[in-house]
Amino acid sequence: MSATVVDAVNAAPLSGSKEMSLEEPKKMTREDWRKKKELEEQRKLGNAPAEVDEEGKDINPHIPQYISSVPWYIDPSKRPTLKHQRPQPEKQKQFSSSGEWYKRGVKENSIITKYRKGACENCGAMTHKKKDCFERPRRVGAKFTGTNIAPDEHVQPQLMFDYDGKRDRWNGYNPEEHMKIVEEYAKVDLAKRTLKAQKLQEELASGKLVEQANSPKHQWGEEEPNSQMEKDHNSEDEDEDKYADDIDMPGQNFDSKRRITVRNLRIREDIAKYLRNLDPNSAYYDPKTRAMRENPYANAGKNPDEVSYAGDNFVRYTGDTISMAQTQLFAWEAYDKGSEVHLQADPTKLELLYKSFKVKKEDFKEQQKESILEKYGGQEHLDAPPAELLLAQTEDYVEYSRHGTVIKGQERAVACSKYEEDVKIHNHTHIWGSYWKEGRWGYKCCHSFFKYSYCTGEAGKEIVNSEECIINEITGEESVKKPQTLMELHQEKLKEEKKKKKKKKKKHRKSSSDSDDEEKKHEKLKKALNAEEARLLHVKETMQIDERKRPYNSMYETREPTEEEMEAYRMKRQRPDDPMASFLGQ
């Protein structure tokens, strides 16, 4: 390491005319440098005492030189110190002390009767100026009148606490305030004692204490547990054990009368899950979660309803699990139909919607059931007898055949029609639906197909039959074709020949145009191949010229290449990976 050289430093003025005189830096000899290094090594090994700063503190010899050396602009005297590495006092934040706190209440001062210099010209307070005054502007300010001077505002100090000061729960607490509570309790205690002394004096005057002292129980040391005297004398003890029975610890009971603790021991007769079936191939027991999900008696052939424990899987289907699954299914179906509901995002809305849906569904089923029963009947079939009478004996005799048909006894009811029976309107002698023809219903008496038409009798039948005959004749005439003349046949033949000639001409034109297009494409491809060869030749010549002598010509074109140019490029490009590329030029 080379010797440190201190540059010349201009003397800084200190205390007026005095100047700090600095010694000229001397160059270290090789011997001094060696001694200095040996001393540093001895200090690091602990054989030599460490350096001491101006405060008498030892300097750790293991601190590097770039940390321990003092900069010339801080201390030119080059004394050994670490003061420049410590926090500088002028840069430290000044925090409020723990005793400082905000003012509570208003300080009562004497009334000011004279205007003070620097006070508000309007009201006379010292804590603000005229432009910041909140009072109503006076006609003549307090500066000139000197009367009715307002008191100074209660200004709170600006406190800035450190980390501990902000979290000090007792900061600003005045212990003298607690003395008020102590005095209040002392007064209550004094009142209790005076009342107690007054009661004792009254009992002594009435002679009750003398009778209790002369009683045989008191002479033998026995005391009446429920006497008023014992209650009065032991009131303080009762206050201590007043709530002792209400705060029992789990597993024990505290008796305040006898002051003993009674343990509640519980006999455990339950069996551990892993001891129910010792077969290693039975249900798996998870020691981490203490769970056995499967039934341990599954391979033993026991009924799961008869055993005391059938696995933990039954919990998955208890409680609200099934209802929650139904709610989730309803949410999915409602979301598919356009409702913005979600089980996790808005469970309350989904629950209310699902409840209203179930109520509406039940109402709809009841309405549908009632409407069907009103229309078709059959309420008596729904009123089934009790279950115990379904397979019991009855007095109704029914005889069946081999095929299940009823031979004797209960007859099968005839199916009722949806139309009203035996209701004849508008002079009809038959009901509606008694006549059917060509997919339409009508009246048999007049062959009318209109339900609310009047009956026409046999005349209506004849009219309908005559209309049908006329319609059949018209359709028959139209179906017979008129015979064509020779002239008409000749004209049709000429038209067909013209059509055939036109088709042949169109085919010929298409074939000729296709051949012309192929020739044009071939010529364009030939021109594109020639242009591609010229371009490749130009590139080859340009690459042979020295880089410094090559012309700077941009080969970029803005137009899009044609299909023939792309085909020529594909045909002429080099393919080094193609094994047959060498035979292309031959």
Swiss-Prot record:
**Encoding gene (name):** SLU7
Reported impact of C123S: Induces a cytoplasmic localization
UniProt zinc finger (CCHC-type) residues: 118-135
**Biological function:** Required for pre-mRNA splicing as component of the spliceosome. Participates in the second catalytic step of pre-mRNA splicing, when the free hydroxyl group of exon I attacks the 3'-splice site to generate spliced mRNA and the excised lariat intron. Required for holding exon 1 properly in the spliceosome and for correct AG identification when more than one possible AG exists in 3'-splicing site region. May be involved in the activation of proximal AG. Probably also involved in alternative splicing regulation.
What is an annotated GO biological process for this record, any one? RNA splicing
Tell me the outcome of changing K129N: Abolishes nuclear localization
List the ranges annotated as motif Bipartite nuclear localization signal. 129-169
Q: Give the keywords, sorted.
A: Acetylation, Cytoplasm, Isopeptide bond, Metal-binding, mRNA processing, mRNA splicing, Nucleus, Phosphoprotein, Spliceosome, Ubl conjugation, Zinc, Zinc-finger
Biased composition of type Basic residues is found at 498-510
Family membership: Belongs to the SLU7 family.
Main location, first listed in the record: nucleus
Q: So what does mutating H128G actually do?
A: Induces a cytoplasmic localization
The segments labelled Disordered in the record are 1-63, 77-100, 206-254, 496-586
- Record PTM Phosphoserine, positions in chain: S215, S227, S235
Q: Which InterPro entries match?
A: Slu7_dom, Splicing_factor_SLU7
Assembly: Component of pre-catalytic, catalytic and post-catalytic spliceosomes. Associates with the spliceosome prior to recognition of the 3'-splice site for step II, probably during catalysis of step I.
**Record-listed N-acetylserine modification sites:** S2
Q: Where is the composition biased (Basic and acidic residues)?
A: 20-44, 529-550, 557-578
Quoted from the entry, the domain comment is: The CCHC-type zinc finger is required to retain the protein within the nucleus and prevent its shuttle back to the cytoplasm via the CRM1 pathway.
- Pfam families named in the record: Slu7
| Impact after mutating R136N | Abolishes nuclear localization
Compositional bias, Acidic residues, is annotated for 235-248
What protein does this entry describe?
A: Pre-mRNA-splicing factor SLU7
Q: Which GO terms describe its cellular component?
A: catalytic step 2 spliceosome; cytoplasm; cytosol; intracellular membrane-bounded organelle; membrane; nuclear speck; nucleoplasm; nucleus
Specify the cross-link site (Glycyl lysine isopeptide (Lys-Gly) (interchain with G-Cter in SUMO2)).
Answer: K349, K408
Which Gene Ontology MF annotations are present? pre-mRNA 3'-splice site binding; second spliceosomal transesterification activity; zinc ion binding
Subcellular location, record wording? Nucleus; Nucleus speckle; Cytoplasm
